A protein has these predicted regions:
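N-terminal secretory targeting modules
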Residues: 1-42, 135-143, 208-255
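Conserved SGNH/GDSL esterase-like catalytic core that processes O-acyl groups on lipids
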Residues: 2-100
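Alpha-helical cap/lid subdomain in secreted, periplasmic
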Residues: 60-192, 196-200, 204-212, 243-255
Length: 255
């Protein structure tokens, strides 16, 4: 095991949601089978506003119950992750607003731990998009968005520069995302690279930990678990979070 980290707090959206089982497995290998994982995630998640996909609505990460729970829990040696910042660009929020939300999230985490990692944006894979592919992915993932390709790319550059500056000013560990983790889809890690990606995000480049074991059964079960608060077609359908004990080890809170 690489350290005495007892708790992982992860903020993100689709990549965190798709890779949650690999992330937890990586945390077990790096930090032990009793590791606690608290995640504020979800497809299309926004850092500061409610987001809706296919009739399901989640509060912004800053408005989630994660922060109340972190205040309630006894302090533990914590590693925190900030990732998947790009959704808010396609929701139409300004770079200034997005960076203010991420800065607020970082400051809340820094009140709990100095061990905070932030990822940048996948500039290389995004900027490979032709006008036709940009329109396809914009329509697929963000149907209401009307930003042009050039407007979106300019905002991506501005937000990415702001993330780098935030990492420097707050002494966060900045993790540049590897272009090789992406394929046809420019914003989601390829499943074949989930293990490598989560090892670097959670443990760091060059660190050697037991390889994460992908479990389809655990992946499926984790994706059936409800977060603390969500709405389906306007009806609230969340679940109070007590820290679920996972069969393969660890405890999980979802927000």
């Amino acid at each position: 095991m690489t350290s005495e980290v007892a708790r992982v707090v992860a903020l993100g959206a689709s990549n965190l949601t798709l890779g949650i089982q690999t992330a937890i497995s990586t945390a077990r290998g790096a930090f032990g089978p009793s590791v606690e994982v608290l995640a504020a995630n979800g497809y299309g998640r926004s850092y500061g506003a409610a987001s809706s996909i296919a009739g399901r609505t989640l509060p912004g990460i800053l408005q989630s119950g994660l922060w109340t729970e972190l205040d309630r829990l006894e302090r533990a040696l914590t590693r925190a992750i900030i990732m998947d910042v790009g959704n808010d660009i396609l929701y139409g929020f300004s770079p200034e607003q997005i960076l203010a939300w991420v800065e607020e999230a970082a400051d809340r985490l820094l009140a709990l731990t100095s061990d905070v990692t932030i990822t940048d944006l996948p500039l290389a894979s995004v900027k490979r998009l032709s006008p036709a592919k940009f329109l396809f992915f914009r329509s697929l993932f963000f149907p209401p968005c009307r930003l042009s390709r050039d407007e979106a790319f300019a905002r991506v550059d501005e937000v990415n520069a702001g993330l780098i500056q935030l990492a420097a000013s707050r002494h966060l560990r900045l993790l540049p995302l590897r272009p090789s983790w992406y394929g046809f889809d420019p914003i989601h890690f390829r499943p074949a690279f989930w293990g490598e990606a989560w090892n670097e995000i959670l443990v760091g480049r060059g660190a050697s930990v037991p390889g994460p074991r992908f479990s389809p059964a655990e992946w499926t079960r984790l994706h059936t678990l409800a977060p603390e608060k969500r709405w389906w077609l306007g009806f609230e359908a969340g679940t109070h979070q007590r820290g679920r004990t996972l069969r393969r080890g660890g405890r999980l809170w979802l927000y």
